[in-house]
Design a protein with these regions (language model features):
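Glycine-rich phosphate/pyrophosphate-handling loop used in enzymes and phosphotransfer proteins
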Residues: 1-224
Length: 224
């Protein structure tokens, strides 16, 4: 008998010929419904590249327009969940309250996109942050899901930037460092991050990858 990964309730499932060889349920019906309710509405009017929700008076995505003036844009963002409600609370508990075992829940919820790429590359945290929480939040989820990845990027230590404006963050030094002997020339990269907000972090990482002559990069985020 298993417990729900989200609420801990006991899961009862009758074994029949129809479900004998299926993977066991890991969420109770109530939690499955709650998580389904915060999935991105793919029918809503969104930017085709970054999935930002667009108002009726927005003819194009201002975020992508801003980024395109400074970076070669990612080809596509893939994401299944809104960064809101249950997901926002869970990521806060996982990253900032250091609840490591929530990586199992995240690994169960997310689905790596079925798209072409040569390397899956997690977006790193600063060494100080990983040392403080004792794990890297993105890598832990990928490991829990059994996904092979390559640690091509490193991040230098820097102060948290949530209080800075977009322009102030842009003026700051790029914190990413390429740390690999892999030949990235002409390769397609899938960057993986926990949250996609303004896109600056992702595109700064992409900037370093383009300097190594990658062909293009796509992004998968746990929440947007």
């Amino acid at each position: 008998m298993n417990n729900c990964l989200s609420c801990g309730a006991k899961l009862y499932e009758n074994i029949t010929i129809y479900n004998l060889f299926k993977k066991p349920n890991r969420l109770c019906d109530r939690c499955k419904e709650n998580w389904d309710n915060i999935k991105l509405d793919i029918k809503a009017r969104r930017c085709s590249r970054c999935l930002k929700h667009l108002n009726q008076d927005e003819a194009y995505c201002l975020d992508c327009k801003f980024l395109s003036a400074h970076f070669n844009l990612m080809e596509q963002l893939y994401c299944q969940f809104q960064y809101d409600g249950l997901m926002k609370e869970m990521i806060h508990q996982y990253k900032f309250l250091k609840d490591y075992y929530l990586c199992e829940l995240l690994a169960h919820l997310i689905e790596i996109p079925q798209t072409s790429y040569d390397y899956i590359v997690p977006i790193p945290s600063s060494p100080a942050h990983d040392l403080s929480r004792t794990f890297n939040p993105v890598e832990a989820v990928l490991k829990a899901k059994g996904i092979r990845f390559d640690k091509i990027l490193k991040m230098s230590n820097r102060p948290k930037q949530f209080h800075l404006t977009k322009k102030e963050r842009l003026a700051d030094e790029n914190p990413f460092i390429i740390d690999t002997e892999l030949d990235l020339n002409g390769k397609e990269i899938l960057l993986v991050d926990d949250i996609y907000t303004t896109g600056l972090t992702i595109h700064r990482a992409g900037c370093k990858l383009y300097a190594k002559n990658i062909r293009k990069f796509k992004v998968f985020a746990f929440a947007r």
